[in-house]
């Protein structure tokens, strides 16, 4: 595990921030400032890495987020925000098992955190753990009924579990949020097909093809 950020600008910013903090302490009490310099350094470093790592994750700079957040993650002093964003960064950089483990720890620590439930539910769909995804995404959909991605992925999970009626219901809610989303029409059609309802499937297949042709123009 690296002990330094990969970006030189981050390092310069960190020590500038540290220098300003020490300067303020020197103005108040020079002796105490020198005595506490090393502890201040550690405290500022931890806060800086945490904030910068979360910022990287939110901006989609997942490799940079991993470098920063690994410095501050502590399994014994659990910080849900750090674990959540480090978990996301792990998943996005291919370390899916490590990311899922952190997200599961996060939901155990904060079961009512909708953000954590959303990310973990979507991750479960990604890794095809559909039975684990459904209860989380149902909870999230109830809390945030206009989230298209949650409604669509909930439909995907239900469809893969053979719960086609429920899947179609979820897909139709997603379709109400984005009426011209071809993949939703196609998903509804496939669910109907698996139920043997060919007549119900046909208009959705046609609509999906029509939307695909329109987007290709």
From Swiss-Prot:
Extent of the TPR repeats: 12-44, 46-79, 80-113, 114-147, 148-181, 182-215
Description of the deletion phenotype: Normal magnetic response, many fewer magnetosomes. MamC is mislocalized in punctate spots throughout the cell. Deletion of approximately 80 kb of DNA, including this operon, leads to cells that are non-magnetic, lack internal membrane systems, grow poorly, have reduced mobility and take-up and accumulate iron poorly.
Keyword Membrane belongs to the record: yes
Molecular function GO labels: identical protein binding
Region of interest: N-terminal domain: 41-112
GO-annotated biological processes: magnetosome assembly
Region annotation (C-terminal domain) ranges: 113-217
Transmembrane annotation, as ranges: none
InterPro entries xrefs: TPR-like_helical_dom_sf, TPR_rpt, Ycf3
Membrane topology summary: Peripheral membrane protein
SUPFAM superfamilies: TPR-like (SSF48452)
Family, similarity comment: Belongs to the magnetosome MamA family.
Something else known: The second most abundant protein in purified magnetosomes.
Described function: Probably forms a large homooligomer on which other magnetosome subunits assemble. Required for formation of functional magnetosomes from pre-existing vesicles.
Domain comment, as recorded: Protein missing TPR1 (residues 1-41) forms an N-terminal domain of TPR 2-3 and a C-terminal domain with TPR 4-6 which can move with respect to each other, hinged at D-112.
Protein name per UniProt: Magnetosome protein MamA
Native species: Magnetospirillum gryphiswaldense (strain DSM 6361 / JCM 21280 / NBRC 15271 / MSR-1)
